[in-house]
C-alpha cells in the first residue's frame, strides 16, 4: 500500500503544481520581492515535495519567518501544527510543535500564533523531558534558544504568518476541525488488497 499511496500523492502534486507555473503580482516592486522570496527559499523545488506530503498527511503549513532580516519559508507537515481558531475561509491561529534533542534531553518547542488587535503575537513555550514519549516540564525558552523571546509581536500585521493547505477531500472522520484527510484515507482497504 505504501508505494501506491506515494504514487497517488506524487501524481496529484505534479498535477497541482509544476515548475512551469508562474506566480506574479501586478505591482512590479512587490512582484520582485515575491520572486526573490520564492527563489531564496527553493520554492520551485520544495513546493511539489511539500504538496505530495500534504496530500499524504491531509494537509501542511507554509510558515513565514525572518532570519537575519531575510524572509524565509518553512514547509511544515500537518502533524506538527494544531489549529486553535478558524473561520469559514481559513485557519487564523494555531500552534506549531518542533522537537529537538540536546545533551540527552528531549525538547518540544511550542510556537503559538495568535491574531490580536495590534498585530500577530507569537508565544514560545519550551518543554524538556528525559523521554521522547513524555511531554515533560516547562523550562525557560532561553535554555535551548537564548536569542528567542517568550513573546514576539508583529505590530500592524492583521493576517496569519502561515498558510494552511489541505486536499480537497471532505473530512468525514473529524467533523469539528478544519483539517484535511490524506487523499487515500477512504480507500485504505482497497489499497491494501
Task: Put a short name on every predicted segment.
Residues 53, 57-59, 64-193:
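Structured, contiguous alpha/beta core segments that scaffold functional sites
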Amino acid at each position: 500500500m505504501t508505494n501506491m499511496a506515494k504514487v497517488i500523492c506524487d501524481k496529484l502534486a505534479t498535477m497541482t503544481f509544476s515548475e512551469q507555473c508562474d506566480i506574479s503580482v501586478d505591482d512590479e516592486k512587490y512582484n520582485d520581492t515575491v520572486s526573490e522570496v520564492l527563489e531564496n527559499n527553493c520554492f520551485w523545488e520544495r513546493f511539489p515535495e511539500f504538496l505530495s506530503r500534504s496530500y499524504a498527511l491531509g494537509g501542511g503549513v507554509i510558515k513565514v519567518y525572518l532570519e537575519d532580516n531575510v524572509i524565509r519559508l518553512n514547509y511544515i507537515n500537518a502533524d506538527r501544527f494544531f489549529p486553535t481558531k478558524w473561520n469559514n475561509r481559513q485557519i487564523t491561529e494555531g500552534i506549531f510543535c518542533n522537537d529537538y534533542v540536546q545533551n540527552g534531553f528531549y525538547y518540544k518547542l511550542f510556537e503559538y500564533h495568535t491574531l490580536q488587535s495590534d498585530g500577530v503575537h507569537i508565544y514560545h513555550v519550551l518543554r524538556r523531558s528525559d523521554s521522547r514519549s513524555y511531554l515533560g516540564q516547562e523550562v525557560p525558552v532561553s535554555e535551548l534558544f537564548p536569542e528567542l523571546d517568550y513573546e514576539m509581536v508583529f505590530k500592524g500585521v492583521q493576517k496569519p504568518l502561515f498558510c494552511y493547505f489541505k486536499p480537497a477531500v471532505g473530512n468525514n472522520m473529524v467533523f469539528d476541525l478544519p483539517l484535511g484527510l490524506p487523499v487515500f484515507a477512504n480507500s485504505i482497504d482497497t489499497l491494501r488488497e
